[in-house]
Swiss-Prot record:
Region Disordered, annotated ranges: 1-31, 75-97
Protein's organism: Tomato yellow leaf curl China virus
GO cellular component labels: host cell plasma membrane; membrane
GO terms (BP aspect): symbiont-mediated suppression of host innate immune response
Official protein name in the record: Protein C4
């Protein structure tokens, strides 16, 4: 049996003790595909505030992307060109009074 790999992510309520824990355990075998078992644990209590506080989610996905993929994503972002501002000071209009 190969290396044991564990991944963890969780979400929790800010004002309560509601917690969701996701974890995956993989057991890679030499010369075989990785087998993954995923578990979800939900402990819910009375909710008073529906505000979510995210912690540790998407961390594994970000690290699995290659630098080439990230550079391509940045290159494809839309750009906004700002108009050039005049170096001169504001133009004064003559007063009619």
């Amino acid at each position: 049996m190969g290396l044991l790999t564990c991944m963890f992510s969780s979400n929790s309520k800010e004002s309560s003790s509601v917690r969701i824990k996701d974890s995956s355990i993989s057991h890679p075998h030499t010369g075989q595909h990785i087998s993954i078992r995923t578990f979800r644990e939900l402990k819910a209590q009375q909710m008073s505030n529906p505000t979510w506080k995210k912690t540790e989610t998407c961390l594994i996905m970000e690290f699995s992307r290659s630098m080439e993929d990230r550079l391509e994503e940045v290159a494809n972002l839309p750009t906004t060109h700002m108009p050039r501002q005049s170096i001169q000071g504001p133009k004064l209009r003559p007063s009619i009074y």
